[in-house]
């Protein structure tokens, strides 16, 4: 029993310690939040303002009727009163409201800038689509047409150069307008400084009008600067597109030359094939004529009788035999002639008369 009692007491003490730790953690978190609040309040105050507020709060606390003034104990840290904490909280709350308003204004301004950027991008996209359709209608369709394949790249280059010149002229115009606005701005600023220095005959309304004019001219100047930057970006993109189109044009030109050479080669081959076809047709006609002639001869051919064939064969053999005999006789006569000629030459040489050609 004694052991159970001791265990229950230890559990109770442990639970109390845990609750005490949780309570201390919650209190420390609240104190840290309060310290952070005070730090933000103090960081916005300079030393003189802080001393003035502190003294005023002390005096207001001492003069409250029905409340006893607290006696300051030496060595004890002085804490803020509820009124001082309320002032700090109100100040921080007011500052937070102002920060929220500033953040809202800033976010709205950024949102307007994003909307303006999107509208500008849409305008640029529409211009690019328009230029693309114009380029396709005037250049690409003519290049794709088989009748205008002989057109050189000068037309494309001239078209792109004209577009770049137009962009450069617009940029130069905006530059001049921007310079005029800057000059006008400097003039207005000089007049404003002169009027401020003189401080004669200038009312608050004049200053407000000048401020309004200054804001308006600043806005116009910012718009012109933005347009100039956008035009520069557009010029860079146009140059990139020009380079890309030049590369594509070079590739297409090479392909066109290859196709032209291939077409010429195939044309020559076709002409050669046509010539060979014509020659084959002529040979075919000749062969057909020869075939018809042979067929006609074959139709008129009659086989002789056997006895007649034997007689003809026998007479042909006798004629061949007679031809061979006469050939031998001719050879014998030629040999005899050569022998007589040599003998005659020897006799003439021996007689000293010399050789006389026969």
UniProtKB/Swiss-Prot annotation:
The keyword Transcription does not apply. Keywords: Cell projection, Cilium biogenesis/degradation, Coiled coil, Cytoplasm, Cytoskeleton. One of its GO terms (biological process) is cilium assembly. InterPro entries: CC_domain-Cilium_Assoc (IPR051885), CCDC113/CCDC96_CC (IPR025254). Residues 93-138, 176-200, 266-343 form a coiled coil. GO terms for cellular component: axoneme; centriolar satellite; ciliary basal body; protein-containing complex. Forms a complex with CFAP184; the interaction is required for functional activity in cilia. Interacts with HAP1 and PCM1. This is Cilia- and flagella-associated protein 263. The gene is cfap263.
């Amino acid at each position: 029993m004694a052991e159970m009692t001791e265990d229950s007491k230890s559990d109770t003490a442990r639970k109390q310690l845990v609750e005490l730790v949780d309570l201390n953690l919650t209190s420390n978190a609240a104190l840290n939040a309060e310290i952070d609040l005070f730090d933000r309040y103090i960081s916005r105050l300079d030393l003189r303002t802080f001393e003035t507020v502190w003294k005023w709060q002390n005096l207001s606390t001492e003069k409250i009727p029905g409340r006893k003034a607290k006696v300051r104990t030496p060595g004890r840290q002085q804490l803020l009163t509820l009124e001082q904490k309320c002032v700090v909280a109100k100040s921080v709350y007011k500052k937070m409201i102002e920060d929220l308003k500033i953040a809202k204004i800033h976010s709205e301004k950024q949102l307007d800038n994003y909307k303006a950027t999107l509208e500008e991008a849409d305008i640029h996209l529409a211009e690019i689509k328009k230029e693309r359709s114009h380029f396709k209608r005037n250049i690409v369709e003519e290049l794709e047409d088989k009748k205008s394949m002989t057109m050189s790249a000068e037309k494309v280059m001239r078209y792109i150069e004209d577009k770049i010149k137009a962009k450069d002229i617009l940029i130069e115009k905006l530059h001049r307008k921007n310079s005029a606005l800057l000059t006008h701005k400097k003039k207005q600023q000089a007049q404003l400084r002169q009027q401020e220095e003189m401080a004669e005959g200038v009312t608050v309304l004049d200053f407000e009008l000048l401020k309004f004019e200054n804001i308006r001219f600043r806005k116009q100047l910012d718009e012109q600067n933005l347009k100039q930057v956008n035009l520069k970006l557009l010029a860079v993109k146009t140059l990139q597109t020009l380079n890309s189109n030049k590369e594509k044009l070079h590739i297409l030109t090479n392909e066109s030359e290859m196709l032209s050479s291939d077409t010429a080669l195939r044309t020559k081959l076709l002409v050669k094939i046509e010539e060979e076809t014509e020659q084959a047709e002529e040979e075919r006609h000749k062969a057909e004529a020869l075939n018809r002639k042979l067929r006609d001869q074959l139709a008129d051919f009659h086989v002789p009788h056997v006895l007649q064939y034997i007689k003809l064969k026998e007479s042909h053999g006798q004629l061949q035999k007679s031809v061979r005999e006469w050939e031998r006789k001719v050879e014998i006569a030629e040999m005899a002639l050569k022998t007589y000629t040599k003998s005659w030459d020897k006799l003439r040489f021996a007689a000293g008369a010399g050789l006389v050609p026969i």
